[in-house]
From Swiss-Prot:
Entry membrane topology: Multi-pass membrane protein
Subunit relationships: Homodimer and heterodimers.
Keyword set, alphabetical order: Cell membrane, Glycoprotein, Membrane, Transmembrane, Transmembrane helix
Lineage: Eukaryota, Viridiplantae, Streptophyta, Embryophyta, Tracheophyta
Name the UniProt record assigns to this protein: CASP-like protein 4A1
Subcellular location: Cell membrane
Biased composition (Pro residues): 211-272
Species per Swiss-Prot/TrEMBL record: Sorghum bicolor (Sorghum)
Amino acid sequence: MGLRDSLKEREDRRSSEEEGDARQSWMTRESTTGWRKESTAALGTPVADWQCVLLLQFGALQQKLLKAFPRAGPRPTTTLVPARPERARKKPHSQPPPSTHMALQAQATASPSPSPSPTRGRTGSGEWPDDAEKLPIAATASPARSSDAVELVVVASTRHAAAAKYVPRRSTSHTADPNPGRGGGGGSAGWYSWNGGRTRTAAPPRHARADPPPAPPRRQQPVEAPPPPPPPPPPPAPAPALPPPVPPSPPAPAQAPVPPSATAPAPAPVPAPRASSPHVQFRSADQVVPNILSRKRRAAAMQRTALLARGAAAGLCLAALAVLAADTRKGWARDSYSNYTQFRYSEAVNVIGFIYSVFQFVALVELMRRNKHLIPHPKRDLFDFTMDQVLTYLLISSSSSATARVSDLIDNWGSDPFPSMANGSIAISFLAFAVFAICSLISAYNLFRRDV
């Protein structure tokens, strides 16, 4: 029986605790909702739930402190008052946000015995217990306070911090404005700030002054160039080298003192370098036109030299191939140049050299007459230089091989008209090689010159 009674008692206690927690949650929610509605109606702007909860919890904390540390005399009751609703309705632009002007004001009233303050449940939650009373909202009028009444204004802060400050009693009003009737329109002492003080009333707007006319721009004075630095002083003359020490000698007879005029003269100072005169620059500018004219004359001379070289190369190649082509059925053996590879090679190179020289001769004549070349300028110099180098190598190669073959024929069969005519053609090919070498130098100059 004892165990059953204890279990039943525990279940009843648990059910009562759950019922108390539910009632406490409902009362907290109802208190928060009522506070938000009344504060919104008073201030004209919505109030957040956390502000109401903060004020309610602060009142509970105050009740706990008063219960833990009782004071002699009447116990103050807590009244939650929104700070200056009349001012907020009249001048909404001059008030701070409503979250920073919710005030908690405690006034002392006579009470015979301290009433039990609301405490938190044993569950450790932040809600109000079952017997917590809903805090009333202050009306426009309130009962008179006793002579020893004090005023405690607690200002709710933002969600980061809160501050409380004791403010002495100033009037019998329970509103946040200690001077409600002065200045018209709900008092002129200002709002209670976060630290318990009052902010000053905003000054009347001043009439905007007309902007002064812009100052005229200042004239910029020309900057004077600093004078040129003085020339550096001449370097000091080197000290004369001391003569080598002379070994002591027997004393000589005393000589007359040397007059001061006979001493060595001091070295003359080195003259400072003279600044270049401005006419030197004009002299270099005057040399531009003669340089251009001399460049043109040099280019014309090079063209005439190249024209003569091309004509000579064409004539020599034509003579060499004609002599070698006529060397057929000559000598005692009735031999011909076409029977030998070296002679055919020399004949082909002379034909190519003749055709190329004629083409270059015609192109130079057109350039000198009409100032227009058959090949564009960027490619012309490279083409001339390459062809001159190749034909020069081919001429010296073919002439050398033909010379070796003629020497072999003379050594084996003796001298007759056939090798003699071949020797004549080879000699003319060597002369054509020399002319092509000169043409190669001219084309290299035209390719790599910088005055183009």
